[in-house]
Structures are given as C-alpha cells and as structure tokens.
Amino acid sequence: MNLIDQIESEQLKLDLPSFSSGDTIVVQVKVREGERERLQAFEGVVIAKKNRGIGSAFTVRKISHGEGIERVFQTHSKMIDSIEVKRHGKVRQAKLYYLRSLTGKKARIKEKLQLKK
C-alpha cells in the first residue's frame, strides 16, 4: 500500500451515516469562540455530494429568514461532530442545483418511504 493511501485511511471517519442528495440532514459543527468550543447545528437538504476518499465533500442548503444559505462540508473533517439524517428525499438527480432557483412549495422534496423488513 502506498504511504499516502495509508495516511489517508487512518484519517477517514468510519461512523458516518449513509445519505445522498435530497436527504434532509443535521450537521453538528464545532465552532470556536475565543477559548470556548461549542456545537452549532446546520440543518438543510443535501444538494450535492462528492466522493473522493479523504477529499469527500457535500453541500447542504437551507432557507434562513427568506435567504438561501449553502454550506460545503468536508466529510472527514474534524470540525464535524456528527451527522444525523432526518428524512430521505425522493430525487432522480445526483446534483440538485435547480433548487437554487425555486422558492416556496416548489422547492419541496417528496419523502422516500422505506419498506421495513
């Protein structure tokens, strides 16, 4: 195994839930304010996901006070404390950039119902 691959595999987080585009998630982010460190929740819809090993990232979009806010998170970053999947969305595309131009009820995503086994 390559030395770079070995170092990258040690840095990967293994406790991540499986989520995809269209899912509504809550990301707990560590925020430093002076000497204090606290957790800040960022809840929104995943509009893009990039799987590139240690360089994996995902983009989350939410509407706050009528303004759309997008934030790109590095999947294996130490600044991410936890990721919780609230609901799975039913979408047919991998990148949901078209949601940027939609507002109100048009921007809603149907929920994907899971069959229990």
Swiss-Prot record:
Q: Which GO terms describe its biological process?
A: translation
**Per the record's keyword annotation, is Ribonucleoprotein included, yes or no?**
yes
Give the Gene Ontology MF terms in alphabetical order.
structural constituent of ribosome
Q: Do you know which HAMAP family this protein is assigned to?
A: Ribosomal_bL19
* GO cellular component, as recorded: cytosolic large ribosomal subunit
Q: What family is this?
A: Belongs to the bacterial ribosomal protein bL19 family.
Keywords annotated in UniProt = Ribonucleoprotein, Ribosomal protein
Family annotation (PROSITE patterns): RIBOSOMAL_L19
Q: What does this protein do?
A: This protein is located at the 30S-50S ribosomal subunit interface and may play a role in the structure and function of the aminoacyl-tRNA binding site.
Q: What is this protein called?
A: Large ribosomal subunit protein bL19
> Gene encoding this chain?
rplS
